């Protein structure tokens, strides 16, 4: 299927390299203007990987485009339609900077939204903060994106990697006062930040880490690392991986007839993408720090909060595979963006947008697990702070 031009409305295409949701004409009084805001539209910019090594994550951008299309079809936000311009960065920091400058300086967007990856968001953060352009609800878990004192225009969404590592450490100690911990981690900022959090969570018991084995994403297998971790005598293993290596690790652990307590990174916590390939029997007992529902899990099919999600995806993304968690994540952060804009009313200055971002009070996002509420402040930019220990029972999470 050919690419979609920047000025095409193409929500149904799953190969769009740039998507624009064009507004309809409507004259109305406006109290305050901001770059990217007119009487009829609010321009939202994004660059994300529609090509390159992380192109699978382009589904996030497509889901967000489809969510904004639904909002436009229902009348928009306070009378304005969303003009969503999403460009391809190929998961290349240099390209991300180029596309971001284009969106800010040529397309005159009000905000940048939902960009993917730690290195890319770090690359564009200085520019956006210097221009006082909101960098909102990014798809990166580094603690570096929750520092409002230094970068007040940048905020993430998911739990930070460090906090997840801390959670693992505390949960391991809660289950065993004298554990032996093995770690499999991706050798980059993602894995290292989680490992640092694990040390913090274990506190004065951090010497309980008896072995730590690393890998790089292009490694064809991690079997040798798992063999070494078993030889260490570890009774608990933390998998700071994404789905591919997580599935490989769980399967190899089972093949070795090794039965440690397994703690899996939330980013790999998909039944269909990780546990099923590893084997449901092999995956039984796997623990995760849960915070978002898995829409492919039958447990949620009749969930009242997710009913709008299932209706939306059936209408706007009928070919989407529910086993890919990108779609629910895109729907969830799209809701965050729309809530903020609605709270702004007619004061759609960038300053007020950030004021609303920092003013969530017990906000309930229906994609999150029951009991998780969102609270922010000018000094606390962590959106999802709470996670819940979940265990796989062979069929679903409990």
Model-derived regions, located:
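Loop/turn elements at helix/coil->beta-strand transitions in domains of secreted/extracellular proteins
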Residues: 42, 80-82, 107-111, 131-134, ...
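Extracellular/periplasmic periplasmic-binding protein-like sensory domains
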Residues: 253-329
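Beta-alpha junction/loop-to-helix N-cap segments that form part of ligand/metal-binding clefts
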Residues: 30-32, 43, 56-62, 74-148, ...
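Extracytoplasmic "Venus flytrap"
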Residues: 34-38, 45-65, 87-93, 116-117, ...
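Segments of small-molecule ligand-sensing domains
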Residues: 315-328, 336-397
């Amino acid at each position: 299927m050919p690419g979609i031009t920047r000025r095409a409305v193409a929500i149904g295409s799953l190969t769009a390299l740039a998507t624009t949701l064009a507004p309809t004409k409507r004259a109305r009084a406006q109290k305050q203007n901001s770059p990217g805001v007119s009487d009829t539209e609010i321009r939202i910019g994004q660059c994300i990987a529609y090509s390159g090594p992380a192109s699978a994550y382009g589904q996030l951008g497509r889901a967000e485009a489809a969510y904004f299309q639904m909002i436009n079809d229902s009348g928009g936000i306070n009378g304005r339609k969303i003009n969503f311009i999403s460009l391809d960065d190929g998961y290349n920091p240099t390209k991300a900077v180029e596309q971001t400058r284009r969106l800010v300086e040529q397309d005159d967007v009000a905000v940048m939204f939902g960009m993917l990856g730690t290195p890319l968001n770090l690359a564009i953060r200085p520019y956006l903060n210097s221009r006082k352009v909101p960098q909102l609800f990014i798809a990166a878990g580094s603690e570096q994106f929750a520092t409002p004192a230094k970068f007040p225009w940048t905020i993430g969404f998911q739990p930070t990697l460090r906090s997840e590592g801390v959670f693992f450490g505390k949960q391991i100690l809660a289950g065993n006062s004298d554990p032996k911990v093995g770690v499999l981690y991706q050798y980059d900022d993602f894995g290292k930040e989680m490992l640092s959090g694990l040390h913090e969570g274990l506190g004065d018991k951090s010497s309980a880490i008896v072995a730590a084995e690393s890998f790089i994403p292009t490694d064809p297998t991690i079997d040798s690392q798992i063999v070494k971790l078993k030889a260490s005598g570890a009774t608990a293993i933390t998998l700071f991986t994404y789905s591919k290596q997580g599935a490989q690790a769980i399967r190899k652990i089972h093949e070795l007839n090794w039965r440690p307590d397994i703690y899996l990174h939330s980013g790999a916590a998909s039944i269909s993408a990780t546990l099923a390939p590893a084997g449901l029997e092999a995956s039984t007992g796997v623990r995760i720090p849960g915070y978002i529902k898995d829409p492919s899990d039958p447990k949620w099919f009749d969930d009242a909060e997710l009913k709008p999600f299932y209706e939306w995806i059936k209408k706007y993304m009928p070919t989407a595979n529910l086993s890919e968690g990108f779609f629910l994540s895109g729907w969830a952060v799209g809701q965050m963006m729309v809530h903020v804009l609605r709270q702004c009313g007619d004061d759609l200055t960038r300053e007020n947008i950030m004021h609303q971002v920092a003013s969530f009070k017990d906000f309930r996002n229906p994609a999150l697990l029951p009991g998780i509420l969102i609270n922010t402040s000018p000094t606390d930019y962590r959106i999802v702070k709470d996670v819940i220990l979940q265990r796989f029972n062979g069929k679903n999470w409990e």
